[in-house]
Amino acid sequence: MTFEFCGGESSILGGAWVCIYQTAEDVGFQREHFEQAMDNVIRHPNINSTVLLRADIVAEREYDCRTGEAVRDGNCGAAADVAEGMLSVGLEDVAARSVHTELDLAVKLEFVRRLVPRNPYKDALINQTCLVLNTREPSETALVVYLPHFSEREDCPFYIPPVAAVGILLHGGRLSVHYIPFAGEGAALADEGQRAVRTARRLLQTAEKHSKGCMNGYTKRVEHDVVVDKVLFQERYIQLKKKYSQWLVDNWAESTDPRKHVFEDIAIAAFLIELWSKIYGQHAEDKFRFCDMGCGNGVLCYILLMEGYAGEGIDARRRKSWGMFPENVRSCLKEQLVIPSLLLRPHPEIRKMASHMEHNGGFFPVHVSSSQLMAPATIVYSAADLITSPQVNIAEFPPNTFLIGNHSDELTCWIPLLGQPFMVIPCCSHNFHGARVRYRPSRESATRLGNSTYAGLVDYVEYLAKAVGWETEKEMLRIPSTRNAAIIGYKNPALGQFPTQQVYDEVLKNGGAEGWIQSATALLKGTPKSH
């Protein structure tokens, strides 16, 4: 679709308005498609600006265009609170505003929304009226208007155009964007290089693209905010980012990009804290402990520990970043190999008959090579030695433990089998030997996530969890990663009875786990992975 710059020409909407951009030809979609698309954009302003986190709908009303009478008041949730230090402009003004046009239009939908930026300590929260107007008689004309609740140019935050009103018009088969400029600023809108003019083009592109999507029957591939409420998560994220992000970025000790890892782990911490509040209720931090299996750089553990949650992180290799944390955090980060106890303990049925048996008598050869050896050698570990080794964690946790697998790679498929409530965010696909493998995705997952190794892994982890009795939930996390599916399980009738026979059966169905100890010891020599 080609867009024509109007150069600040007079607008069909009237003398106060200025036309900025319009489509060069008919758009092809109908008014209903335009209104459906713009309703979604009004409710999700982050579509137009990545600076914005969300919109809280303060008021919503529908009118009969012919009579002007209100026919529906929408149910509106609470608007965002403004914490100390956050910026805001005119939030006490919640009365819907109106606008004059020379077209014979009447209000169909009226919203007052509160725009919440990602960093409200830098960008101000504002209220804004959003109107959807139609002609009184049936036609294909519709207008969407945005009216900020301030009247001075100086009050305008960076994330919206610096104008008094924005109009997106569908009329005569074409789409166009119009502004009402602040006093004395109309001449600047004739310059295509101005930020407000460039923004008008993006607004037109978004409206045209999303309207065509509605016409073509577009549906979202994934749903967010299924398990944890979006507002609760986002408010928690803002709090944690304010407290921890700057220090973590400034003191980053790894060679990886600090901003990606820091903000991703802050988002995961925010999600976990709200999830735990949902599961355990008030004062959740007093009711359980966490274990982050494959904790990597330790940032997630650091945030959770600093927020008052008891727990620990385990990884096969110590990271440089561990040294930057305070002693109370460093003492909770453990350099250990995870070797699940079901590989070392007697089968539960055998222990019933011989309760004195602490290990299964197994021996595990591990091939090693070194420049200090005359030739490759084999070390044989016994189950008894591995159970008592301080360098090994056999994943026998207290009953009030919640397991976290945040891109935990080789451990991912093991975590649902360990008999504790868990959240796993799969990343790289491995079997119970620790070897790379590709699992086939279901038809549904292939449609939503693509016919990929990742989709297959997510499906397999969910299958494993259900096979051993977990009621599972899935959430597509709001994190800066394409591998953002979280599988969650915290209800299981067999809780306290693991490892069950189903656990042994699933390990055997997937080829057993004889190679796990060899693979686990190899992790000690490899380079730590970065996701």
From Swiss-Prot:
Disulfide bridge map: none
Any one GO MF annotation of this record: tRNA(Ser) (uridine(44)-2'-O-)-methyltransferase activity
GO biological process, one term: tRNA nucleoside ribose methylation
Localization per Swiss-Prot or TrEMBL: Cytoplasm
Enzyme Commission number(s) from the entry: 2.1.1.211
UniProt keyword annotations, A-Z: Cytoplasm, Methyltransferase, S-adenosyl-L-methionine, Transferase, tRNA processing
UniProt catalytic activity: uridine(44) in tRNA(Ser) + S-adenosyl-L-methionine = 2'-O-methyluridine(44) in tRNA(Ser) + S-adenosyl-L-homocysteine + H(+)
Any coiled-coil regions, as ranges: none
Cited InterPro entries: SAM-dependent_MTases_sf, tRNA_uracil_MeTrfase
Transmembrane segments: none
Primary site of residence: cytoplasm
Group of enzyme by EC: transferase
Gene Ontology cellular-component terms listed: cytoplasm
Pfam families (UniProt xref): AdoMet_MTase
Family as reported in the entry's similarity comment: Belongs to the TRM44 family.
Function per UniProt: Probable adenosyl-L-methionine (AdoMet)-dependent tRNA (uracil-O(2)-)-methyltransferase.
Protein name: tRNA (uracil-O(2)-)-methyltransferase
Annotated organism of origin: Eremothecium gossypii (strain ATCC 10895 / CBS 109.51 / FGSC 9923 / NRRL Y-1056) (Yeast)
